[in-house]
Amino acid sequence: MAPANAPRNGKYAKSSQRTLKRKRVQEDLSSLVQRVEDLDLKESFKAFTDLPLSEPTLSGLSASHYKTLTDIQSRAVSHALKGRDILGAAKTGSGKTLAFLIPVLENLYRKQWAEHDGLGALILSPTRELAIQIFEVLRKVGRYHHFSAGLVIGGKSLKEEQERLGKMNILVCTPGRMLQHLDQTALFDTYNLQMLVLDEADRIMDMGFQKTVDAIIGHLPKERQTMLFSATQTKKVSDLARLSLQDPEYVAVHEAAASATPSTLQQHYVVTPLPQKLDILWSFIRSNLKSKTIVFLSSGKQVRFVYEAFRHLQPGIPLMHLHGRQKQGGRLDITTKYSQAKHAVLFSTDVAARGLDFPAVDWVIQLDCPEDADTYIHRVGRTARYERDGRAVLFLDPSEEQGMLKRLEQKKVPVEKINVKANKQQSIKNQLQNMCFKDPELKYLGQKAFISYVKSVYVQKDKEIFKLKDLDLEEFASSLGLPGAPRIKFIKGDDTKERKNAPRAVAHLSSDDDESDAEDDEKKSKKKDAPQVRTKYDRMFERRNQDVLAGHYTKLINDDGTLADPKATDEADEDNDFLSVKRRFDAGDKQLEVGGSSDESGSDSEAETGKKDVKVVNIDGKEPLVIDSKRREKLLKSKKKLLKFKGKGTKLIYDDEGNAHEIYEMEDEEQFRAKGDAKEQQARFLAAEAERTRLADVEDKELVKQKRREKKEKRKARERELLAQEEQEEMLVQLPPPEDDDQGRFSPSEDEAPRPSKKQRVQFAEPAESEEERRPKKPKKSTAEPKEIQTLEDLESLATGLLG
């Protein structure tokens, strides 16, 4: 018999090893949780090993060559490990990506998150390129974890993403595609989400993504940890309320710094007229062929035109272009090539302005003025990253200089002015004109670039910087190689709007001149000769007044249309009454025959006739309805039209004692004063109503959310049933049909037609006399029908025939 301490072999040894390993993992996890709870937030950390991090995270950081913490990482990671909401703000290139990726991995690891737990962390990025960059860093740092991570951006197959989305624990995505999956993917749930991260939060929370982000947040649970990171962080209460942040920790490591940009960045600006911008840019590229440069423009059409034009001119350095209209594969190839290149020029829109980490960028050129100081900070942040050196140049038109410098000064951005040497400046205006003349496509691109630039200036909100009327657009079009400035509709619309809103006095200043009068007369005569279209408003103004006061007005005017003099004497009135109209009779009126010599008899008879024609109908109203015309008679037939003549109904409410009261009753003055001051009562009433509406709004939102959730669950249940049915149909195996031997045991019914059988054909064979006849012969076609098997004797005879 083996001793008690002998080592175990086989199945028992493996199970004991698994038990020990599980026990060791649980002990490490409990100690890690205890270290996080004991973490001092005021302590400063310098290395990643000083933080309470798990072994897989430390191994991933070490393999990716991350050893020391940056300022934003040192302060933000400790708060995030504690589960607090964070608003992180730091300069560009300070390592904000790791500041939120490490807490995401650690918090899910401590909760032992697995595939069946669903989505645990959601990371939103404003651009596809930044999302790809975050995902690559996540893959490097989290390579030793067992989480499933996914990248969800536009430009890829939706069905492929839908099949894999339900199995993901961490998602890096753009807002638009994420909302599409939340609405359409049945097997994707976010009810168990633990963390929400917004990189470049100020860009995501602005007007461009507002509706999309609100819709995404509506799908997420309120009990979650939320982290916002950006170089220019938002502090708006409305934005924070939309994200349901709970006592967020504001981490701004460079808030007290002298400048908002890195100290290793040299920043300059050049004042140049708009038509000379391309000439100076070409001269700059030609003089810096051994450097890596990014050129920012305001629109994608400008990027395409400048890229195509400079590509034809061949400056002697690789040229690339990046804008939002490109397909996802092309954008990814361009960013990869530019990252790997040592010397290149990239023409780009603001797609590349935020978050992208291009290594060893020497120059950032802003050919067009940025919309605000925040955009400037993000653009120049593509260089001078991680304490490297970098240089930036801003091109400003003379009309933009004062306003932009003022905005940069408010954001603590130091910029120095430099001048361009005249002997190094080269003009490419004639070459561009020659190329546009020979190539219609390039000319078309130039026209579109001109229009898009003018439109980008026109839509800017800061009119202190962007003054469209001060720009020399004709010369700018000529500098692009165009024969003339294209027509722009919205500028013409502004002129017509100004003419329309001009005061009338200004419009009539020139009416005293004889020449203008003659021109007006000619225009009027032309208008009279031309056929005019009469509208319903014209017919309305031509209609005669049928109001009650029409008769009084006719008495106030003379026969020639002039107003009667109210200060005239009675004698003048008597003279006028001599031939004035006293009464009008219709043709065939009986009163003409009777006549009347005196005014009194006429007036009496008129009153009598009036009394005969007038009817009075009492309805439920304040005053009776007078029927004095056929129109009023028709009015009696319409209940709908009579409603406005009837009084409004009164609604009564009953108190607890059963006494009837009107809905709105006026209080006595003493009762009103007993309740306090009027302003205090007003404040109390407004507060009570606000609280009531707030509670009702919460209930309504919860009801709508519940209905939406139920509808989505029903739709997902239907899709699950369809998927299950498809899987069952694929797994079903068809049974083979029964053999002929089994069929021969049963006799066919009388209704069925007799089925010929190969075995039944043998019944025609008779015992052969010779061997040759016994040999099997080919079956011949026979018109005779086979004999049916009806009795047991027929079956026996068939069997004997088969046995021979």
UniProtKB/Swiss-Prot annotation:
Chain ranges of the Helicase C-terminal domain: 277-436
Keyword terms, alphabetized: ATP-binding, Helicase, Hydrolase, Nucleotide-binding, Nucleus, Ribosome biogenesis, RNA-binding, rRNA processing
Primary enzyme class: hydrolase
GO BP: rRNA processing
Compartments, as annotated in UniProt: Nucleus, Nucleolus
Matches recorded under InterPro entries: DEAD/DEAH_box_helicase_dom (IPR011545), Helicase_ATP-bd (IPR014001), Helicase_C-like (IPR001650), P-loop_NTPase (IPR027417), RNA-helicase_DEAD-box_CS (IPR000629), RNA_helicase_DEAD_Q_motif (IPR014014), SPB4-like_CTE (IPR025313)
Binding residues annotated for ATP, in chain numbering: A90, K91, T92, G93, S94, G95, K96, T97
Motif position, DEAD box: 199-202
Chain span(s) of sequence motif Q motif: 46-74
EC numbers: 3.6.4.13
Cellular component per GO, a single term: nucleolus
Residue span, Helicase ATP-binding domain: 77-251
Catalysed reactions listed for this entry: ATP + H2O = ADP + phosphate + H(+)
Family annotation (Gene3D superfamilies): P-loop containing nucleotide triphosphate hydrolases (3.40.50.300)
Composition bias, Basic residues: 706-715
Coiled coil: none
Composition skew (Basic and acidic residues), residue ranges: 521-541, 695-705
GO molecular function: ATP binding; ATP hydrolysis activity; identical protein binding; RNA binding; RNA helicase activity
Segments for region (Disordered): 1-24, 493-541, 589-615, 695-804
UniProt-listed PANTHER family: RNA HELICASE
Assembly notes: Interacts with the U3 and U14 snoRNAs. Associates with pre-ribosomal complexes.
Reported function: ATP-dependent RNA helicase required for ribosome biogenesis. Involved in the release of U14 snoRNA in pre-ribosomal complexes. Required for pre-rRNA cleavage at site A2.
Domain notes: The Q motif is unique to and characteristic of the DEAD box family of RNA helicases and controls ATP binding and hydrolysis.
Family: Belongs to the DEAD box helicase family. DDX10/DBP4 subfamily.
Name listed for the protein in its UniProt record: ATP-dependent RNA helicase dbp4
Source organism: Aspergillus terreus (strain NIH 2624 / FGSC A1156)
